[in-house]
């Protein structure tokens, strides 16, 4: 597909606004929002001042940085399980590794965090049967949702380019299971002309719906999942969620451009003379024809002045720099810190990459902050990944005739483990609480082992039956061992 394409814009006002705003967020992610910043500066300070500032530079993008910072759920492979068929779960996990699904999932999380939605298609090559997880940004998607589950599509349209009559054209690929008895997949051009047979050589409607996208009972399903940045989305699309972060990114970029302008034009003291001229200067004409005195020199030069009129008092003086760069930089960095907090990141979650305690530039998550973010985001993405696991098992069954369960899969994400020091500190604190009677034994075991209280209770019951349960808690030194 050509790389220099322009995405079609939906004809409706709401659809057009959604796509245009989503594309702004994507330009921020890809570092191609220079023109957006130029327009913002002109609208904010006027064309004359904007021209005086010069071309703005993209020195920071908090929206992109925050989206990438919190996308830590797929730093390691997730565990796939099934209560009734562990072997099937292992096969799904193995297929994901072959597909390199984790890297696609992580990229999808970045898109989801920044644009609030992302499309993930489980594509099965009709010729080879190979599976691939396609990632599609929401500016290329439209669809209709299940009324009872507003975040789950029953019809999805993807804008993409196909070769038709030896040239690339924009088409809409429509997948629909609104009517389970009459599902269809169609390729339509801009005039709604059906190009399915020209592109694929056949139609996919009703009984011709691809068998690989049918469940064991014959019901069709969409090989798509739309991830959302919230656990219970109220609609299929929510493009303006966290608009404050996008606006703040524009504001701090404008502030950065102004600081750069002041650094270049107003960071030095202003020296003035009256009725004096540097000795040895040469008279020249300026661009407007007025006379000017020119003298070659630098900061190490010692200048001598001579009066122009012996009858008039000669004077020289100096004004301070016109811009207080330290104050400007302090306000700029504090605003960056507020943007991070508006994303839900507390100061305890962050580790600074500079020795200046006031600075909020180049923040990254601490180990505890990473675990906290993983725990907060897991309930949001788990339903989507469990749905993807079920789709994967279903497609595998159609391909190899297997009988794997086609629902009921469970996803557990691999949280960042505690460091040795963190584990020892946790054990000391937990045992101290247990010795004081502030927490029961199952809670203490759950905290130390990193499991649930129910699982810890089962372990304690098993230890009691085996007669290996200690009658008193170990000391902190014993726990460290």
Regions found by a protein language model. Name each.
Residues 1-155, 163, 475-481:
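Extended, helix-rich architectural segments
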Residues 102-116, 120-121, 259, 263-264, ...:
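C-terminal amphipathic alpha-helical
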Residues 112-114, 119-238:
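Extended, regular secondary-structure scaffolds
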Residues 204-365, 414, 418:
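Extended, charged amphipathic alpha-helical segments
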Residues 268-271, 278, 370-386, 392, ...:
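Long, compositionally biased
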Residues 426-436:
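Short, amphipathic alpha-helical "recognition" segments used to contact nucleic acids or chromatin
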Residues 436-446:
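Short, charged amphipathic recognition helices of the HTH superfamily
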Residues 447-475:
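Long, highly charged low-complexity segments enriched in Glu/Asp and Lys/Arg with interspersed Ser/Thr
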């Amino acid at each position: 597909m050509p790389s220099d394409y322009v995405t079609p814009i939906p004809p409706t006002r709401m659809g057009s606004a959604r796509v245009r705003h989503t594309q702004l967020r994507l330009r921020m992610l890809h570092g191609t929002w220079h023109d957006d910043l130029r327009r913002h500066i002109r609208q904010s300070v006027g064309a004359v001042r904007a021209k005086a500032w010069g071309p703005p530079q993209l020195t920071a993008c908090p929206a992109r940085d925050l989206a990438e910072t919190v996308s830590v759920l797929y730093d390691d492979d997730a565990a796939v399980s099934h209560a009734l068929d562990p072997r099937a779960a292992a096969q799904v996990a193995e297929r994901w590794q072959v597909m390199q699904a984790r890297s696609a999932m992580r990229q999808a999380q970045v898109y989801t965090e920044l644009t609030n939605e992302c499309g993930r298609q489980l594509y099965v090559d009709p010729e080879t049967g190979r599976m691939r997880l396609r990632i599609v940004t929401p500016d290329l998607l439209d669809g209709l949702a299940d009324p009872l589950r507003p975040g789950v599509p029953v019809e999805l349209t993807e804008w993409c380019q196909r070769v038709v009559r030896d040239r690339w054209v924009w088409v809409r690929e429509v997948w629909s299971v609104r009517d389970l008895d009459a599902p269809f997949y169609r390729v339509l051009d801009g005039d709604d002309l059906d190009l399915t047979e020209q592109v694929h050589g056949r139609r996919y409607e009703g009984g011709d719906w691809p068998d690989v996208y049918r469940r064991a009972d014959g019901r069709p399903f969409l090989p798509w999942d739309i991830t959302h940045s919230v656990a219970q989305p109220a609609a299929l699309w929510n493009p303006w969620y966290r608009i404050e972060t996008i606006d703040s990114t524009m504001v701090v970029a404008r502030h950065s451009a102004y600081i750069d302008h002041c650094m270049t034009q107003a960071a030095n003291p202003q020296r003035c003379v009256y009725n004096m001229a540097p000795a040895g200067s040469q008279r020249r004409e300026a661009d407007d024809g007025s006379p000017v005195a020119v003298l070659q020199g630098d900061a190490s030069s010692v200048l001598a002045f001579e009066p122009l009129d012996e009858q008039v008092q000669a004077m020289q003086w100096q004004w301070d720099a016109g811009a207080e760069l330290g104050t400007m930089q302090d306000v700029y960095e504090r605003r960056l810190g507020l943007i991070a907090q508006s994303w839900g990141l507390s100061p305890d979650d962050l580790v600074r990459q500079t020795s200046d305690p006031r600075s909020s530039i180049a923040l990254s998550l601490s180990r505890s902050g990473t675990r906290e973010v993983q725990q907060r985001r897991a309930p949001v993405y788990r339903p989507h990944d469990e749905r993807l696991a079920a789709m994967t098992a279903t497609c595998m069954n159609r391909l190899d005739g297997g009988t794997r369960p086609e629902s009921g899969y469970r996803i557990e994400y691999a949280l960042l483990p505690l460091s040795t020091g963190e584990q020892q500190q946790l054990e000391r604190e937990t045992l101290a609480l247990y010795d004081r009677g502030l927490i029961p034994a199952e809670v203490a075991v759950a905290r130390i082992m990193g499991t649930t209280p129910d699982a810890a209770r089962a372990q304690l019951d098993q230890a009691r039956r085996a007669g290996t349960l200690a009658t008193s808690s170990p000391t902190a030194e014993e726990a460290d061992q």
